[in-house]
């Protein structure tokens, strides 16, 4: 049976999109009719999306800083559940990828809860954002950001590239450690957990560093080490991610314990296979999208109200893999969806370039600029994969933080789940690390920790 989904089978209705002219308001409205990051403060006309008030969710009992974040909205009940039987009723608020999941898996469902616009960030981040209009610019060619080292560069984006650079540079914390598990799931639901320990140091938008202390043209440092299974344990990946990739491309190195050698890894980019992902994601799928923007033309289509993963506290910590991982898709009783306004950005592969995905459609949360959903198409125009980013607000930071990341292959019926956490896995543990900890010479030591 042919399970390929074509764009002609599932037509995404853009009729409900807000026109760009109506949303490109003057920067003077930031913090007034617009939130500090450029979202509409007001509720929607139906009252199904509330106004944004900037309040930080309360800390429930049982909170363990950096590890366990209990659900501040645990008392909420689903408003309704979207199933394959009634998907047509709700299709105006669904993406093509979501509709395809219902067609592929008849037992798939979305539990839709009351909307909480809980994405909030530190005041210092808002303050730097307010200074960016007229100062922050795209670098020549659009493959980087210049004129600023902090805040959200383009709270009122003029085009698709500016919107994508908001997604790439959004505030994701400071310097921290995190533990997580990745599983590449077969069609029958089998998997071998791969356990990672990661360290990150964000330079752009860091509030622990004054602008003059932020390393020039560096977005972040990233170290990823595998601790299990035994056949992969000790492998380490190091990435130095530049801000303006027209100046300096991404630098990456790997350490293989069997060879006991550190090697440069120029292929850790674009559509080369992701670490231990069994071919189910590309390197630039990590975090739903990362890296250079030079292979696509990005179009800012407008805004749309979509059921997106949001406030996914039940899914984000203390999860048992055997309860969560099922054939075809995760156990959707762990997932929470809410109606939110998202920016729709359509990316089409430039002529003369190549990529596994000929087209990507991004759905960026208006309150955080995180990509919450992405639909990916192959060279024949067929819907190939769809991905979703579940997120929570870390109410002690505060910030909107991506947790479980899912990549569904609609053609093979397989999927990849990343950043699954159980027990006392660290979610966000602040760390004191220096540039030396992210130097290639440190990789051998990292592999034996």
What is each stretch, according to the model?
Residues 12-14:
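Aromatic (phenylalanine/tyrosine) cluster motif
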Residues 16-22:
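N-terminal signal peptide c-region/cleavage motif recognized by signal peptidases
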Residues 27-55, 82, 95, 223-293, ...:
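Gly/Pro-enriched, hydrophobic low-complexity segments
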Residues 179-228, 286-362, 372:
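Extended beta-strand-rich segments in extracellular/periplasmic secretory proteins, especially
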